[in-house]
Amino acid sequence: MSDDTPKFSVLMAIYIKDSPLFLSEALQSIYKNTVAPDEVIIIRDGKVTSELNSVIDSWRRYLNIKDFTLEKNMGLGAALNFGLNQCMHDLVIRADSDDINRTNRFECILDFMTKNGDVHILSSWVEEFEFNPGDKGIIKKVPSRNSILKYSKNRSPFNHPAVAFKKCEIMRVGGYGNEYLYEDYALWLKSLANGCNGDNIQQVLVDMRFSKETAKRRGGIKYAISEIKAQYHFYRANYISYQDFIINIITRIFVRLLPTSFRGYIYKKVIRRFL
C-alpha cells in the first residue's frame, strides 16, 4: 500500500470471561496484517482478569494500543459505543477478542473502501474453526450489495467479526442499541433503513472461533426469549414485515429450543446457513 493509505482504527471489546490465550492470538493476527492500524482501541467491559491485562501489556510494544475500562459490565453494545467515541479515524474495523484476522484483511478492506466510496458498512465471509483455523471447513457466506436488503429481513447481512464501517454513519443512526445478543443485527437493520449502503467482500478474511460450547450457548429459554424480543423490535421499527416476523419466530425458536446435542448437529449441517 502507498504512503497515502487511509488511517484506520481497530475496535475491540473484552470482558472478564475472555480467554487470555485467544486474546493474544487475536492481537497477534492484527499485528501480522500487511497493513498496520493507526490505533487499536480496546474497551474492557467491566473489570477483567490480571491475565487479560498482562496480554494487553505484552502487545503494547508492537501495536498502538489505547485501552479503556468501563466501571461495570454494560454489555457489548454499550462497550462498542464507548469505544467508537475513542476512535480517532472515520474508518473503524471491528475485531473480536477470540477470532483470527487473516493477514490480508485490512489491506482488502482499504482497497475495497477506496474503490467504493459510497459503501458505509463492509464485511466478508468468515470460516469457522474450533481448535485451529480450517479444522471445520465451514464458511459463513454473506451476500453482495444487491442482495443485502432482502437477505437482512431474515438474518444478519454482515458477519460482525469481519465488519468495518464509517464511524460518522454509525454515529448518525445512533450507534449500537441494547438489544441483548442482537446488538449487531439491530444496528445493521437500523443503518440500512436510514440510508446506509452495505457490501461484503466475497472471500474469507476472518477465522471465527465456533466451538461446541458456542453452539450450546446459542440455545435455551433465555436465548429464545431474546430472539422473540429482538424480532418484535425489528417488526415494530418497520425493519421487517409481519410475515417476516412470524416466519423468523417459528424457524428460529424451534432451533433454539432443540436439545443441545441435536441442536449442535442441526446447526452444523443446516441452520448455520440461515441464522
From Swiss-Prot:
It comes from the Bacteria. One of its GO terms (cellular component) is plasma membrane. It catalyses: N-acetyl-alpha-D-glucosaminyl-di-trans,octa-cis-undecaprenyl diphosphate + UDP-alpha-D-galactose = beta-D-Gal-(1->3)-alpha-D-GlcNAc-di-trans,octa-cis-undecaprenyl diphosphate + UDP + H(+). Optimum pH is 7. It is found in: Cell inner membrane. Mn(2+) ion. Can also use other divalent metal cations. SUPFAM superfamilies: Nucleotide-diphospho-sugar transferases. InterPro entries: Glyco_trans_2-like (IPR001173), Glycosyltransf_2 (IPR050834), Nucleotide-diphossugar_trans (IPR029044). Its main location: membrane. It is a peripheral membrane protein. The keyword Repeat does not apply. Its cofactor is Mn(2+). Pathway: Bacterial outer membrane biogenesis; LPS O-antigen biosynthesis. Pfam families: Glycos_transf_2. Catalyzes the addition of Gal, the second sugar moiety of the O7-antigen repeating unit, to GlcNAc-pyrophosphate-undecaprenol. Belongs to the glycosyltransferase 2 family. This is UDP-Gal:alpha-D-GlcNAc-diphosphoundecaprenol beta-1,3-galactosyltransferase.
